Amino acid sequence: KYGTKFQARSNLFDHAAHNGSNYLKGHCFVSLMLHVPLKSADGITYLSVPLGYRLWTRELSKLELAADMVRSVMTELSSCRQVILLCDSWYPKKPVTGLVSEFENLEMICCVRSDTVLYDLPGERTGRRGRPRIHGSRLELSSIILNKPKGASYYMGCRKVITNLWKGRIVHAYVTATDPGKPGSFRLFLCTAAPEDIAVEPEKQAEEKICRYNTWGMLPLGLFSLRWNIETSYY
């Protein structure tokens, strides 16, 4: 296959500019991987199992493809097991974020753009007539208090917020930064589950990052580190 003479070819953005250009002609696949917790002598480890790869042909958007893949897997999993969907900043949009409302046992931990709109929680009702406020005032990432735990490479902080990605739902925003004085170094992650409601036993984990981030009070960030396995699965 070369040039433009092959089926389902698209002009794709390549952030790494592997060929010296920000764009390349090629195929785009949406992939889904399941991390299965296993007991071992060292503690709980995770077996990464690729579940599917779907070629993007423009009949559906990549977000719709991803949502369909997750939906097909969720219908096969036991509803009594908590499932956490990990994804990068491309996927936290309506077709995918809406899955959390479709399945009671599904939560989501995702990286999002640092300019994603965040709101404070609404204040207590005043007793006046009228509809109660859906959310508080808009928040800037710089308003979230960041600390650098011992042994950490980043400053980090957490705050309960409301976002338009899940309207009316309280989620947890996690912020990391190499330098709190430089907004360009901020990264933003969102978790739909409260840390205490995440069904893992941190003290039994064999994954070093999960244990370390749990010690710092940032368990969702440790779990998000498992997402990298889907990147290396292509190699």
For the regions a language model picked out, list residue spans one by one:
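Single, function-defining residue in the core of a domain
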Residues: 4-8, 39-235
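Active-site-proximal, Lys/Arg-enriched surface segment
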Residues: 1-43, 156-161
